[in-house]
Design a protein with these regions (language model features):
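Conserved donor-binding/catalytic core segment of Leloir-type glycosyltransferases
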Residues: 4, 145-163, 169-173
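A conserved, positively charged/aromatic
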Residues: 66, 91-118, 122, 127
Length: 293
């Protein structure tokens, strides 16, 4: 099986990490992958560093390389458009965001759409995509070493116009707890005791999964696909997007080390059982085979 991956992102966000993890996982399974991504993108540079076949993204290269591969996998909206314009190969499209579909014509020709959550699947269906064309493939993350820190960690930029960051800061002030901001989550999780993830639109939340994999209890917004990975009071805390509710959630974990430990252990187990990179790779391969059969 030969797969051409397309990603137009210029930053290394959750979606780009998933592309990189998918390609490295596919290589372990004997699947040949090639990436087309923007020339200056971190994803392209990281793929080359991992010795994965990768080239700058462009319409002509999509057209040329699509003919040499069995299937094209577009990982975002712009690359979806490029695939439709430049290729007649079987097409799989990942949909990671919770926004409504803006251009329905784009969503009529792919062999399968990979929704990152059941919530995103419902958004696709509302946009006119037939249910039988949608497969839910959850993000996968590596299992990190258990965190041993004391910090209350929050993302400095979660791509949500800073609304979530402002809310986290307000809640931490109410709870009289200092926040540590991070732009390098995987590295900084080593210092974390609590992870706060607040957003107003979320397809799933791969940053949350990464924290859970390190056994860090999470306080997260009750929104989008997040309730599919966090079971309130079972493996984390879901809260309404109000400073008071968030402050209460942080305070519960701060004031009850036993609760924090229980939720952190359950969170790590959840990732082990359902959200590893291997789970994501194998489920994606199943979809590839279905499309090509």
């Amino acid at each position: 099986m030969r797969i051409l991956h397309l990603d137009s992102g210029n930053e290394m966000r959750g979606g780009q990490w998933q592309v990189l993890r998918l390609m490295t996982g596919l290589r372990r399974e004997g699947v040949l992958s090639t990436l087309l991504a923007p020339a200056a993108s971190p994803l392209l540079q990281k793929a080359l560093k991992e010795q994965l076949p990768a080239e700058p993204l462009g319409l002509l290269r999509v057209s040329t390389l699509a003919r040499r591969n069995d299937l094209v996998h577009a990982h975002d909206a712009r690359s979806h458009t490029l695939a439709l314009l430049a290729s007649r190969s079987p097409l799989v499209v990942s949909r990671r965001v919770a926004f409504p579909i803006r251009s329905r014509w784009k969503y009529r020709s792919a062999g399968r759409y990979l929704a990152v959550s059941r919530f995103v699947k419902s958004v696709l269906e509302a946009g006119g995509v037939p249910e039988e064309k949608i497969a839910v493939v959850y993000d996968g993350v590596p299992l990190l070493a258990p965190a041993q820190g004391t910090a209350v960690l929050a993302l400095a930029d979660n791509g949500d116009s800073q609304k979530g960051a402002h809310l986290a800061a307000e809640a931490a002030h109410l709870a009289h707890i200092p926040l540590q901001w991070t732009r390098d989550l995987e590295n900084d999780l080593k210092q974390a005791a609590i992870f706060v993830y607040l957003t107003y639109s979320e397809g799933l939340g791969s940053a949350v999964l990464l924290a859970m994999s390190a056994g860090v209890p999470v306080v997260a917004s009750r929104i989008g696909g997040l309730p599919e990975i966090i079971f309130d009071g079972g493996n984390g805390l879901l809260v309404d997007n109000s400073a008071a509710a968030v402050a209460e959630g942080i305070g519960k974990l701060r004031d009850s080390p036993a609760l924090a430990a229980r939720l952190g252990e359950a969170a790590r187990l959840t990732v082990q059982q359902r959200f590893t990179t291997e789970h994501m790779v194998h489920r994606t391969m199943e979809v590839y085979r279905e499309v090509l059969s």
